Amino acid sequence: MPVVRSKICGITRVEDALIAAKAGADAIGLVFYGKSPRAVSLQRAREIVAALPPFVTTVGLFVNASRCEINEILDAVPLDMLQFHGDESPAQCEGFHRPWYKALRVGGGEDIAAQVALYANASGVLLDTFVAGVPGGTGECFDWSLIPPNLSKPLILAGGLTADNVEQAIAQVRPYAVDISGGVEASKGIKDAVKVETFVRRVRSVM
């Protein structure tokens, strides 16, 4: 089985970004959504990105942001990739000169394969748990058996993952990558070093 990548999302402090990098995480996520307790300012985002060692991908998370707002952030922060976690259409995700992927929320009634196919130019698709009124970071799992096999895009699995269930998740879903935020926190926006290290180690242990 190919190595599964890991992303630690909702990073708000330089020290937490360095913890993730030291643990071997492949990517970190910065939330540019003001309603989130994990939102970061432009200044803090710049500090975090500047502190990272090479080969750690920086992902900016947006929720129904305007094109102007996204461009302003990209002018200020050297992000590698964009994650669209709202109700963005394919056209709204394109044109930023960065690779991007779309988050889709799974609640049980969707045609996941058809939704994935709509985002033809995405680098991948992230599947998260549907909770009404909450775009992400719910801390709840969805039924992984709802994921169709052989999706047309690399799959990033999110939603309620922890060090205790990630090995089972990988074995069942066989995703390209896993994405975690609340499952490695001491409190909202503050990461727990032991939880981060344990999570990444267990992701890497799955063969």
From Swiss-Prot:
It comes from the Bacteria. CDD domains: PRAI (cd00405). One of its GO terms (molecular function) is phosphoribosylanthranilate isomerase activity. Pathway: Amino-acid biosynthesis; L-tryptophan biosynthesis; L-tryptophan from chorismate: step 3/5. The keyword Chaperone does not apply. Belongs to the TrpF family. This is N-(5'-phosphoribosyl)anthranilate isomerase. It comes from Stutzerimonas stutzeri (strain A1501).
